[in-house]
Amino acid sequence: DTLSLHDALPIFMSDCVVVNHQMGSYLATKHLIELGHRNIACITGPSHLEATNGRIKGFKRAFEEKGLEQRKELIVEGNYHIESGYIGAQKILNIDPSITAIHVFNDMMAYGVFECFKDKGIKIPEQISVVGFDDIFFSKMLYVPLTTIALPIHHMGGKAVELLIERILNKSLSFRCNIVEPKLIIRKSTCDIQIQK
């Protein structure tokens, strides 16, 4: 028997602990919309990953709930590495340099976005707001601390151990999947659109 922590398939063939990816991106995008942003871009992960697809659904859902148009050309695919965040930001600026906010599907790519904007003299959040996803260690230490979506890693680890012990003690148990909820961590990389120049 196996135990997976991430990217479980829709039909679970093992015990698993997974993040509600859709809710995470929904919270990130809703935060930007509540700050008055409408021209919001997005850098995703690889399209074949279940986590990416869930996050895209959450991104779009936030627009749909408010009856807002979401421009498909402002969704750019990345690969969860820093350099793809840099390249993705360049692509988005080439498509529409008037964007006011960007949701990046992980913090590593957000670091690349920060570097791109720094190289181009674009100030965060005074000119563009940025929201990441994962809340990894260095995100709070960037030159502008990153607003992001936090994953309850310790809870996930504890739940995974709990499921594994129960599986060892009773191999006849049906497969179980525990879905954990992410939360929005607001730092300094987002601001109200009225404050932006």
Give the ranges of each region predicted by the language model.
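Short acidic capping loops at alpha-helix termini that bridge into adjacent secondary structure
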Residues: R38-N39, Q70-L74, K123-V130
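A short acidic, helix-capping loop that chelates divalent metal ions and anchors anionic groups
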Residues: I11-D15, S139-K140
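Non-catalytic positions within long, well-ordered alpha-helices that form the structural scaffold/packing
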Residues: I33-G36
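Flexible loop/turn connectors
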Residues: Q90-K91, I95-K197
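Hinge/beta->alpha junction and helix N-cap segments in small-molecule ligand-binding domains
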Residues: C16-L27, I43-G88, H103-Y111, F133-D135, ...
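Short, small-residue-biased leader/transition segments that mark boundaries at the very start
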Residues: D1-L9
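Rossmann-fold NAD(P)-dependent oxidoreductase module
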Residues: H31, A62, C116
